């Protein structure tokens, strides 16, 4: 085993860092993997990301930049849904075990429980340390009202007990790991994600409105996948409860999961039933350089999620100088400083969100002050800093003794 990290095998089984965030299985984790690996590569760590092939058009190997390659692995049918991916864990693991980039790796960084299971097996086969970022936890989602299979939770528990390091995005995720999974706090590394400040930075709202074709009235923006966890239904209900008939809500995202299309139909019907269908503007996921313009066009970015391990959308909005109104859950409590950079809503109800959003629309000077502070706060979060922390943490694992769960 090496005494430092020069080569890192990154496992992202269920979704590729090359995928468009905001639809299907693409979300904040895609951004995280892509940005973290790019920053590691720029710091001199050779990284290979292994993901399952989900399209016949995907090349077997793609070099994103020097030190950052993506390998698409054949495992199961191309169109296998995420809920069935546990069926291909053996096939995926076997393919990685024979890959020269895995055999040469100093350590493994696995993302999400499916990848964590693969990493757990490879750790023991190869005798190299395993760091795991869960991004979401089954017990947390179940507590927020989302049904999660018992298999996921039991496997998460096993991974927690054997991973050499657990990477938490913020203190609340650390607390969830220790409370819900009895994780050893000494093996938890809190590493805040970053944001690309070259893309996401303050700018002219008037110019952004012209570029997006939005009018002069109040604009609320929701960015994310159309799934119950993200709460677009709550954003629509809040719009309907507000006494601001001049306000519009832009919903930027696409359906996700096996019930995604059905949920999209439900929320569209909800907007019609509440009489605000004409004030909800539906947009597909956008490339990130275009997304930043939509952030700047907004008066408020709304993040009504049931749970979030961090909340990259909230951080991107903050970096653009836009106040965020978010649920007071998980890592959103790290990204949004309540009353300073935005507003946290402790009660996840339409009335509570309508009141918080309405208070900012009624006081543009206060909203502008929050946005300015948000941009300052966001400067604390960079991918260079996050990668340096991760590199240090994994390097220490390489010099230590592996956790043995067998």
For every predicted segment, state its role:
Residues 1-72:
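N-terminal subdomain of nucleotide-sugar transferases
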Residues 214-230, 236-239, 250:
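Conserved donor-binding/catalytic core segment of Leloir-type glycosyltransferases
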Residues 261-286:
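Nucleotide-activated donor-binding/catalytic signature segment of Leloir-type glycosyltransferases, i.e.
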Residues 285, 293-298:
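Short alpha-helical donor nucleotide-sugar binding micro-motif in glycosyltransferases
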Residues 306:
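Aromatic "clamp/platform" in nucleotide-sugar-dependent glycosyltransferases that forms part
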Residues 314, 323-326, 336:
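Short hydrophobic beta-strand element within catalytic cores of glycosyltransferases
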Residues 338-339, 343-350, 359-364:
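Conserved acidic donor-binding segment of nucleotide-sugar-dependent glycosyltransferases
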Residues 359, 366-380:
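A short, well-ordered alpha-helix in the C-terminal region of glycosyltransferases
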């Amino acid at each position: 085993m090496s005494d430092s990290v020069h080569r890192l095998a990154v496992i992202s089984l269920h979704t590729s860092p090359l995928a468009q965030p905001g639809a299907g299985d693409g979300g904040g984790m895609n951004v995280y993997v892509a940005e973290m690996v790019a920053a590691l590569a720029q710091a001199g760590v050779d990284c290979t990301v292994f993901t399952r092939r989900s399209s016949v058009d995907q090349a077997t190997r793609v070099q994103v930049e020097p030190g950052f390659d993506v390998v698409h692995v054949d495992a199961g049918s191309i169109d296998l849904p995420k809920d069935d991916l546990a069926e291909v864990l053996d096939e995926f693991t076997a393919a990685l075990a024979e890959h020269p980039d895995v055999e040469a790796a100093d350590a493994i960084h696995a993302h999400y429980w499916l990848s964590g299971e693969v990493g757990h097996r490879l750790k023991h086969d190869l005798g190299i340390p395993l760091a795991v970022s869960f991004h979401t936890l089954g017990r947390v989602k179940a507590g927020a009202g989302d049904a999660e299979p018992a298999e996921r939770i039991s496997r998460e528990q096993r991974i927690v007990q054997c991973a050499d390091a657990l990477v938490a995005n913020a203190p609340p995720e650390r607390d969830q790991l220790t409370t819900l999974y009895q994780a050893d706090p000494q093996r938890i590394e809190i590493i805040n994600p970053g944001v690309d400040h070259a893309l996401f930075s303050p700018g002219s709202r008037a110019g952004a409105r012209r570029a997006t074709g939005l009018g002069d009235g109040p604009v609320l923006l929701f960015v994310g996948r159309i799934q119950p966890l993200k709460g677009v239904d709550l954003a629509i209900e809040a719009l309907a409860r507000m006494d601001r008939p001049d306000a519009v809500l832009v919903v930027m995202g696409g359906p996700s999961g096996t019930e995604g299309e059905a949920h999209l139909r439900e929320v569209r019907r909800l907007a019609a039933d509440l009489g605000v269908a004409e004030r909800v503007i539906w947009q597909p996921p956008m490339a990130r350089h275009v997304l930043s313009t939509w952030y700047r066009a907004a008066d408020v970015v709304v993040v009504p999620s049931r749970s979030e391990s961090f909340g990259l959308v909230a951080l991107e909005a903050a970096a653009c100088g836009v106040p965020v109104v978010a649920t007071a859950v998980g890592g959103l409590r790290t990204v949004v400083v309540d009353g300073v950079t935005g507003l946290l809503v402790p009660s996840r109800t339409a009335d509570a969100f309508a009141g918080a959003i309405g208070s900012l629309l009624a006081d543009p000077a206060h909203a502008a002050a929050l946005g300015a502070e948000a941009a300052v706060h966001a400067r604390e979060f960079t991918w260079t800093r996050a990668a340096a922390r991760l590199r240090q943490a994994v390097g220490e694992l390489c010099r230590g003794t592996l956790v043995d769960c067998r």
